[in-house]
A protein has these predicted regions:
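Rossmann-fold cofactor-recognition segment
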Residues: 43-56
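Residues lining the SAM
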Residues: 6, 73, 284
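Redox-cofactor binding/interface segments in oxidoreductases and associated redox assembly factors
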Residues: 69-73, 102
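A hydrophobic C-terminal alpha-helical subdomain
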Residues: 229-305
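Oxidoreductase cofactor-interface core, primarily capturing Rossmann-like NAD(P)-dependent enzymes
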Residues: 1-38, 55-58, 63-65, 76-83, ...
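A short hydrophobic/small-residue beta-strand
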Residues: 49, 99-100
């Protein structure tokens, strides 16, 4: 059985390929990337590295040829994802891929959800259901790493955690746990036409998170609630673009204020308050908590700023 992983030179894709190498022959792994040179180390291990671009449908069909399963790692740009994912799903069908596993995003309400990202992901899920392929959807929640790497440092420097999410809650999950779930679905039977919500072990507000980061970093942080316009002003002050099609990458994490403000609005409205045991179901282990990851990275947090 051959498995193709899209976006294989990114953080999620590279970790997935590394995990697959521990479970199956390298020659059965196809790693797709726009820039094959970035995966020279994987090619040296025998992985079949292929060039492919979501904006070039012909390249996708070539990249997917011979694969039975595909991990479709979602593209990053809000508003551009759906046409890019349509290209990938249509190419998978043309190449004879039997089962597509997709990294989506949690959220209640689907069309009524305030998050722009949720709208994009539900659009892709609809394409999958209509594709004639077997499918599995992994609705990942916010990465814990995004909180620790992209949000906490500014709060530690300034002593203020600014948010428009109010006291709404979300169950952040580590990228490592998300990758482990993807690998489990790719390498074990029984996941066809199923939606999994991949969450951490605990629902937390940003107020809760600020308190944890403050405690572990041993530095005071005030939680400051603003309205949506106040949140836009905060992101403007950081130089982050508003337009979600021009996201700024910070520590490997794409940011745009349209995207982030809409997510925090959805959190405030309770639309992201989802907690499951799907990580444990798929991997046999409990997901890592935000506190545990923050403690493991406490030295970084204590020197932040």
């Amino acid at each position: 059985m051959s498995i193709v992983v899209t976006g294989a030179s990114g953080l999620f894709g590279r970790a997935t390929v590394a995990g697959l190498l521990e479970r199956m022959p390298a020659g059965e792994i196809i790693a797709m990337t726009r820039q094959p040179a970035k995966l020279a180390d994987m090619a040296a291990k025998g992985v079949d590295v292929r060039q492919g671009d979501f904006d070039d449908p012909d390249s996708l069909e070539r990249a997917f040829a011979g694969a039975q399963k595909m991990l479709l790692i979602s593209a990053s740009l809000v508003g551009k994802r759906i046409p890019q994912h349509r290209n990938a799903i249509e190419a998978a069908a043309a190449a004879g891929v039997e089962h597509v596993i997709y990294t989506s995003y949690v959220g209640r309400g689907d069309d009524q959800n305030a998050s722009l990202a949720v709208s994009d992901h539900r659009g892709t899920e609809k394409l999958l259901r209509e594709s004639g392929r077997r499918w599995t959807v992994l609705r990942n929640t916010q990465y814990t790493e995004a909180v620790i790497e992209a949000q906490a440092p500014h709060a530690l420097r300034t002593g203020r955690w600014i948010a428009c999410a109010g006291d709404g809650r979300m169950a952040q999950v580590t990228r490592e746990d998300c990758v482990a779930c993807a690998i489990a679905v790719l390498t074990t039977p029984g996941h066809e036409d199923v939606v999994y919500n991949i969450t951490g072990p605990e629902l937390m507000s940003f107020r809760d998170i600020a308190a944890v980061i403050s405690e572990i970093a041993e530095r005071p942080i005030e939680y400051v609630v603003v309205d949506d316009e106040g949140m836009y002003a905060f992101f403007d002050s950081l130089g982050i673009p508003r337009d979600a099609s021009k996201e700024e990458v910070v520590n490997g994490i794409p940011w745009s204020s349209d995207d982030m403000v809409s997510v925090e609005r959805a959190i405030r409205l309770g639309q992201m308050e989802i907690l499951t045991d799907h990580v444990q179901q798929l991997t046999g282990r409990r997901p890592q908590s935000l506190r545990a990851l923050a403690w493991a990275r406490r030295d970084e947090l204590r020197i932040a700023g």
